[in-house]
From Swiss-Prot:
GO cellular component: axon; cell surface; dendrite; glutamatergic synapse; postsynaptic density membrane; presynaptic active zone membrane
Membrane topology label: Single-pass type I membrane protein
UniProt xrefs under SMART domains: IG (SM00409), IGc2 (SM00408), LRR_TYP (SM00369), LRRCT (SM00082)
Keyword flag Transmembrane: yes
Assembly notes: Can form heteromeric complexes with LRFN1, LRFN2, LRFN4 and LRFN5. Able to form homomeric complexes across cell junctions, between adjacent cells. Does not interact with DLG4.
Signal sequence extent: 1-16
Protein name: Leucine-rich repeat and fibronectin type-III domain-containing protein 3
Cellular localization per UniProt: Cell membrane; Cell projection, Axon; Cell projection, Dendrite; Synapse
Record-annotated LRRNT domain positions: 19-59
InterPro entries the UniProt entry points to: Cys-rich_flank_reg_C, FN3_dom, FN3_sf, Ig-like_dom, Ig-like_dom_sf, Ig-like_fold, Ig_I-set, Ig_sub
PTM annotation: N-glycosylated.
Glycosylation site positions: N81, N339, N348, N393, N462
Cystine connections: C317-C366
Amino acid sequence: MAVLPLLLCLLPLAPASSPPQPAISSPCPRRCRCQTQSMPLSVLCPGAGLLFVPPSLDRRAAELRLADNFIAAVRRRDLANMTGLLHLSLSRNTIRHVAAGAFADLRALRALHLDGNRLTSLGEGQLRGLVNLRHLILSNNQLAALAAGALDDCAETLEDLDLSYNNLEQLPWEALGRLGNVNTLGLDHNLLASVPAGAFSRLHKLARLDMTSNRLTTIPPDPLFSRLPLLARPRGSPASALVLAFGGNPLHCNCELVWLRRLAREDDLEACASPPALGGRYFWAVGEEEFVCEPPVVTHRSPPLAVPAGRPAALRCRAVGDPEPRVRWVSPQGRLLGNSSRARAFPNGTLELLVTEPEDGGTFTCIAANAAGEATAAVELTVGPPPPPQLANSTSCDPPRDGEPDALTPPSAASASAKVADTVAPTDRGVQVTEHGATAALVQWPDQRPVPGIRMYQIQYNSSADDILVYRMIPADSRSFLLTDLASGRTYDLCVLAVYEDSATGLTATRPVGCARFSTEPALRPCAAPHAPFLGGTMIIALGGVIVASVLVFIFVLLLRYKVHGGQPPGKAKATAPVSSVCSQTNGALGPVPSAPAPEPAAPRAHTVVQLDCEPWGPSHEPAGP
């Protein structure tokens, strides 16, 4: 009996033999399906009509599908502590905003689908924490800006990046160049106008590059393209081949795209948009010899300029060519000039010296270069002594204009500047412009017999008021051309080029025939129209006079007709019958009764009853009537 109490005391110390209880899981969100029977856990909520990310998500889930809903934003707390999530789909929602750090806890995430939303930009903190991300799908959004550091955390692991169907005009090309493991890069259907040289040189694992339907006019050659074989069709291509797609771009087919034409490609959709001679033609049907460039020609440069020291000066240089030449400036000391504290170089060929110094005087050289060659022009700058300080009683505070003489400019420099300003650049002996009026000019050039194989002549000209270059293609047997539709009172720079076939290379080349400058006559000033208030008052007076005259004529006609009909209206004069008054005599004597005048036979008798204050007659006294 003593053993029983001892056993009762030892019973609480015995180990529990029941199995361990599983961890309590979160309930499945409403309208969602949760697969919790087997690992990994999945939460599936596609097309559930959700307005936000459900707060009761199981944080142990490895897959979360929230596609085809109405979620407008992703907040920081929506996906917090989901460290085991591998796949996240937010496709086809209405997401406009992703909070910074919204994916910071998703360090195991491998695939993120944000396509079909309304994102307009992607900042540096919105993808922070995705250190294992491999697939990033951002297509069919409204992205217009992509921050340079937006992909920093996933740059080493990203394999698939899709930015297609957005509004991207620029990309952080330096950041894209760090995606060393990317296999597929989709940039199609955006607004990209240019690609820098070497943008893809470090993407050694790139297998597909799609830049279809952008605004690219040229594509610079890249070491990646020359190192790998390129095929347009992915089917049947070897594993190491690069699939390259550039269709739907307005390509400018000149010598800069010869490298692309030499590649062995099939069934692609590239077409030429320019120059006009090749516009609309299939890219691969254009012969390699037709991809030509035109060397630059300097069409306008500043005349010799004289300014006092300390004042600004602007040197201008304009050049034309295909492709558009790039203009650079070289100082009199032989240094290449660029943007600095004292100088600014603009893309249109203008060099602005903010503060001139005596050592700046000399000959500046303008160099216009493109893929076909280069052209140079010299501009003289004379820097005079600095002006004295303005006096207190000075009546003018405006500095003299560049190139105009003033009291501080040496006489020689002033006269030289005035002479250059008043004269026009000399005309090339080979090209003459005659019979130029207000809107037309006749251009003539000599025969180019020393140049064999001339196909045509090209005339390039523009006015001093704008930089738009106008081209005219002339047959090879012509020696003159009449330019029409010119603006009156403007100065034009014109060059004639001979397009011929180079016998050495077999390619089409151009050779300058000559340039000329001419001015159209000012248009005749038309006669001034009458002043508007004066014209209006005159019209009112004239109309009033006509109305008054009409009224007077009408009144005169009425008076005339009234007088003709004896003072009675014409209608009533014809309708009234003559009436005679007959009265009886009180003394019984009946006097003679005056008879009424006989009516006209043609006029009908009018039966008119007239009541008179007279004595009645008897039957025997009734007058005999007709």
